[in-house]
Amino acid sequence: MQRAHPASTQRRAFLAGLALLAPHSSWAQAGTPASTVTTKPIPSTGEQIPLIGLGSWITFNVGNDRVAQDACADVMRAFFDAGGRMIDSSPMYGSSQATIGHGLARIGIGKGLPFAADKVWISSGARGPAQIEASRRLWGLPRFDLLQVHNLLDWEEHLPALLAMKAAGRLRYVGITTSEGRRHREVEALLRSQPLDFVQLSYNLLDREAEERLLPLARERGVAVIANRPFREGALLRELARHKLPPWAAEIGCDGWAQFALKFIVSHPAVTCAIPATSSVAHVRQNLGAALGAMPDAALRRRMAAHVASL
């Protein structure tokens, strides 16, 4: 199997502190049974979030099908019960935002859940605020935790607006997104020039271009990284399912290829969390299992990547 490519003062103080710690000593385990998943800090604030989030691309785009909406709500309930927090969506994702709102209303989630991440995706800066408000109403939340400029669309207008929302206390974090290896040079320039809290990009066992420049730069700049497309929309797992999981995967508690793939991603020092999407309760529980137990060190990560490349 071939990989796609070979290869403010508060923030500075926080990063300096991290530099004094062992590579993974900033990872935390929450103390209650429902939240024993491993977490990592958001560099700009130190707030801890679980290593595994929940994406909604395709899987939550179920229209007005109430049975499917309820099934997605069950996935969300299982996600929260297993210690998950971040749910990510976008106006681009069809009815996914409304599905999330239905699920949150049905479950009756309390304060602090979810960590709501959405995006602005419209080719007009003037229309951005209206789109954001429409998205907020679909979720049924008082505000978002994180808003991202989706695929850098009209970022020159949207990014200043999001930063103004944050300064006014109407938003906690600001980010940008890209996917499938596109526009990495532009993302790099924005990481260097803009006060970003998050960057979202594609990173998985095969798509590893971000390792070369973006992941090291995000770590240097104190920007949290969300990894999207961890399974290549399922194609990676379908291919891996043709092969047996190597016995040494048990060293880090993997009980399947999904956990193998996710542990590889979130064990990268620069990656804050991954956001696999699923419409299966069993799968969301398996995915959250990747945030439990031991994580691969650098040597084991190399072994994991080499093994998959050899298949």
Model-derived regions, located:
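N-terminal binding-site loop/beta-alpha segment at the start of enzyme catalytic domains
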Residues: Q2-L113
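Generic structural signal for well-ordered alpha-helices
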Residues: T39, M76, Q97, G101, ...
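Short, well-ordered coil/turn segments that N-cap beta-strands
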Residues: I49-I52, G84-R85, G110-P114, L141-D145, ...
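Structured C-terminal cap/extension of enzyme domains
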Residues: I42, F198, R213-L311
